[in-house]
Amino acid sequence: MQPTSRLEIPRTAIKLHALISDLRWRVQLLDSDIQDEEKRTGISNISNTAYPILARNLRIRRGNLLATITMLESQLAETDMAA
């Protein structure tokens, strides 16, 4: 395995920052879409059996993105410590 150059660490950090920022923006879009769907159907209680499937799926996707953001933030912290 080749050693990481000093220039590679900042590039990695910049890429991670950009990716995290993009994913946070997508989470905000999903939040908006979820709210729109809940308003459209008039059902916002997720435990309601009539809760919209679209909103449920969007919530799952949002959760996955949030988990990815958490993982990337830990990678970023490791990268920052290596710099």
Task: Tell me what each language-model feature is.
Residues S5-D36, T70-M71, Q75-A77:
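N-terminal acidic leader/helix
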Residues R59-T79:
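Amphipathic alpha-helical coiled-coil segments
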